[in-house]
Design a protein with these regions (language model features):
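Internal/C-terminal transmembrane anchor helices
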Residues: 295-298, 341-378
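Long, hydrophobic alpha-helical segments
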Residues: 62-91
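Aromatic- and glycine-rich beta-strand/loop motifs that create alpha-glucan
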Residues: 1-28
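Alpha-helical transmembrane segments of polytopic membrane proteins
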Residues: 65-66, 143-154, 247-258, 322-335, ...
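Helix-loop-helix units of permease transmembrane domains in multi-pass membrane transporters
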Residues: 82-115, 278-279
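Terminal transmembrane helical anchor/hairpin motif
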Residues: 3-5, 42-59, 183-269, 273-283, ...
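Cytoplasmic membrane-interface regions of multi-pass membrane proteins
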Residues: 7, 91-92, 170-172, 267-285, ...
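Secretory targeting signals
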Residues: 57, 111-173, 186-189
Length: 379
């Protein structure tokens, strides 16, 4: 008799694979084209002129940078498919009526999506190693590094997408949470620095963003680097191979570890998630005010500054921006964002009377921000 307390359910796993195979097939086809097919095409085209350095660069560049692109998008697609039952009341009730624990449902669904991605990457790069065998590439420093990089990236992006699926009961809200979450913190830092630089004496808003690592795709692409290995012959240097830098591998490993922590958080959330929250924009009552005021603040900072520049700023000379005008535009944008969030949560346009108190809080905070900036309270 099957144990109902197992953390993995084979029957559920097979059922999930049946629903996942079209996406899995498309994902596999892309990887096969990018690695073994492209490698074979290059070898055939150059007919002996294709060096080991060329092959190592193709493998590493595809695994590292191609992996960022594919994992970013397909991690979301696999998460949406694996946890699609959380966005349909009938499916949610059906899953939660199964004689298994929530942990079993979560881990089985999570591992299904992860298995599809990691198994595809494994097979693809093993085929790539077979195609490049005549060039005698180092397996671990080239193929292994490229394959490992792609796997680490897949773990992070997929785990973050799963967390986004936990936070909402609307299938179309998950991509919004996912894309915004991947750029939110450094984006807001940049906008706030720009805002402060316009009105605080002696403060430059054009310094580098300190929290860029919290935008994983934008941080990984330039920071994860491929190093060239050169050999000197007759006073000339030739690139003989490429390898993944140790620092680059540690960056990807750190993101993958963060992904596992994120997956654990998603599991803890799933254990307490109520079935009746299916269909809600925000799946947890405690997160509702965070969502409302977060949307209001982000809209105020982003859209408000754009609105001021569009209406007034482009006609002002450098250094003559109006703080009251900027705050007014930010307050207007913040109120739009707040009521838009209220409409999404309540699923109704009739939110203005009930949301008046929250709107007043948003406007008040932004006015206080303007007062603080005018007196330069930060020193």
């Amino acid at each position: 008799m099957r144990s109902a307390t197992s953390f993995f359910d084979k029957t559920l796993f097979r059922s999930q694979l049946k629903h996942t195979w079209p996406l899995w097939l498309g994902y596999t086809a892309l990887w096969l084209f990018l690695v073994p097919v492209m490698l074979f095409s290059e070898l055939s085209a150059y007919q002996g002129g294709y060096s080991a350095a060329d092959a190592s660069y193709l493998l590493l560049n595809t695994g590292v940078r191609g992996g960022i692109f594919l994992s970013f998008f397909f991690g979301l697609f696999f998460a949406m498919l694996a946890f699609s039952h959380l966005t349909q009341s009938r499916a949610t009730n059906g899953f939660h009526a199964l004689p298994v624990r929530r942990e079993t449902i979560f881990l089985t669904a999570y591992l299904t999506g992860l298995f599809c991605q990691l198994s595809t990457i494994l097979v693809t790069f093993l085929l790539g190693a077979a195609v490049s065998a005549p060039l005698h590439l180092s397996f671990w420093s080239v193929t292994g590094a490229a394959m490992g990089s792609a796997m680490l990236e897949a773990v992070f992006f997929y785990s973050f997408a799963v967390l986004c699926m936990m936070m909402t009961g609307q299938i179309l809200a998950a991509p919004v949470f996912y894309f915004v979450g991947n750029i939110l913190v450094p984006g807001m830092e940049y906008l706030l620095r720009n805002f402060a630089g316009n009105f605080l004496y002696g403060y430059s808003g054009h310094t580098d963003v300190a929290l860029g690592f919290l935008s994983p795709p934008l941080y990984m692409y330039p920071e994860v680097d491929i190093a060239s290995i050169e050999t000197c012959e007759s006073d000339s240097y030739y690139v003989t191979a490429y390898a993944l830098e140790h620092r680059s591998f540690m960056i990807l490993a750190a993101y993958a570890l963060a992904g596992l922590v994120i997956a654990l958080i998603a599991l803890l959330l799933y254990r307490t998630r109520k079935s009746e929250m299916t269909g809600s924009t925000v799946a947890f009552p405690w997160a509702t005010p965070i969502f409302k005021y977060g949307v209001a603040f982000c809209t105020a900072v982003a859209l408000g500054q754009f609105l001021y520049y569009f209406l007034f700023g482009q006609y002002c000379s450098s250094g003559s921006d109006s703080l009251p005008g900027t705050i007014l535009c930010m307050a207007a944008a913040g109120l739009v964002g707040y009521f838009a969030a209220e409409m999404l949560i309540k699923k109704s346009f009739r939110v203005f009377r009930a949301g008046a108190k929250g709107a007043a809080i948003v406007a008040g905070v932004l006015v206080l921000l303007g007062i603080g900036m005018s007196f330069d309270l930060t020193g």
